[in-house]
Amino acid sequence: VHELLDRITDRGKPVTYNRVKALVSRIFKHGIDREWLDHNPAAGIPKKPERSRERVLTDEELTGLWEVLEAIRTGTRPTPPISSMLARGLQLMLRTAQRGGEVFTMEWGDVDDASGWWTIPGTKTKNGTTHRVPLTQAALALITEARTDGSGPDGLVFAGREGRTLEWQAKKAVSKLRHAGLAGDYTRHDVRRTVATGLEELGFPTSTIAHVLNQQEGGPRATKIYARHHFDQEKTVALEAWGRHLDGLIHGVTSARVVPFRQ
């Protein structure tokens, strides 16, 4: 057991170390419960301290990731490690800062093309509350392209073959890009954190960023309904500013700092 865990330690993976240790301990405990073993050799091994990730992509990494996804989406990169539909969904994550699980379970009924809003039902959000996401023209274009690329008109927007979900493949997409030498040492969630950090650097207050990310604190039902709609305009301004900033990075134009409006 120590030899196994030492190999993980040498790789600098404390989270993996703790997960493997817990799994091994459960296996031995099961053996004791079945009277196959008389002791658990993993029981006295201490956990490794875990630090929350604070990884944020640099402008160069962000631009590089976008260019890779764009090449895959448009079919100009030979033998891509992920599908064009996965690349399209990841680009929407970069445009909207929403969780991958929410993007890849998006259904056509959740999207209002006319008003430019994506409504994520509480059954799909992490905090269980309905979340309204403003869609910029660039974000809507990705969704429209998915429709013309064989997805819809019913069911999932970013669907695989025969309309099947890509949620599981999406969890591994950034890792596949990294193993192919097309992405750096970052995760899908780091991409979302990068957008949040970018909004902060553009001058938006934490309250607006929290509502963009759907991380606002819970409260009375009336308060939650008020907050959800009260921040629609702020969320729209924030994601439009982020879209301009992202486009500026992609095209080599520096964005100016935004001074958010106040009501």
Predicted regions and their residues:
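Short, polar N-cap/turn motifs at the start of nucleic acid-interacting alpha helices
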Residues: G109-W117, A183-D185, F204-A227, D247-P260
